[in-house]
Regions:
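N-terminal Rossmann-like FAD-binding beta1-loop-alpha1 element of flavoenzymes
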Residues: 1-24
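Conserved N-terminal/central alpha/beta ligand/cofactor-binding core
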Residues: 27-149
Length: 149
């Protein structure tokens, strides 16, 4: 995987869990997550019967360029992904009863954003880095791939 942000880390974890030996290559040092952009939160259909409204909001916000199959898959996996991160140690802001606090965000017709406040990106990256370490995923830091576009 090229990069060390949340997407690359999660992809490497999936590879390791399926029996392959992934390698993370990043131009910055370990822990820098140079490719990680700040995120407002994690969207999941936690207060909905299913993810169909989430999928429709995503398709509506993305317009004609939206891959409907990908939108359905990603929106459908939101709750399971959030639960996985919690099992691995992510501490979400919660509401009474212990469920994740959900709030509104542009493009969503209902409250479905959740997270760790301003530290969501940092905390998700930290959790995924811990999981990568537990799996012995090799990392090359301070490495540049010349000619890579």
């Amino acid at each position: 995987m090229v990069g060390a942000g949340p997407a690359a880390l999660r992809a490497a974890i999936a590879c390791a869990d399926s029996g392959t030996s992934p390698l993370l290559i990043d131009a910055s040092g370990v822990g820098s997550a140079s490719g990680a952009h700040s995120i407002a939160g994690i969207a999941a259909s936690i207060d909905e019967l299913d993810s169909s409204a989430h999928r429709e909001d995503t398709i509506s916000a993305g317009g004609e360029s939206t891959d409907k199959i990908s939108a359905a898959r990603v929106c459908g996996e939101g709750v399971a992904t959030l639960a996985e991160l919690e099992r691995w140690g992510l501490v979400l802001r919660t509401r009474e009863g212990g469920l994740p606090h959900a709030y509104s965000a542009p493009g969503h017709s209902v409250d479905r954003m959740t997270g760790c406040g301003d530290s969501t990106t940092r905390e998700v990256t930290r959790i995924l880095e811990e999981q990568a370490i537990k799996r012995g995923i090799q990392r090359w830091a301070d490495t540049y791939l010349y000619g890579w576009q």
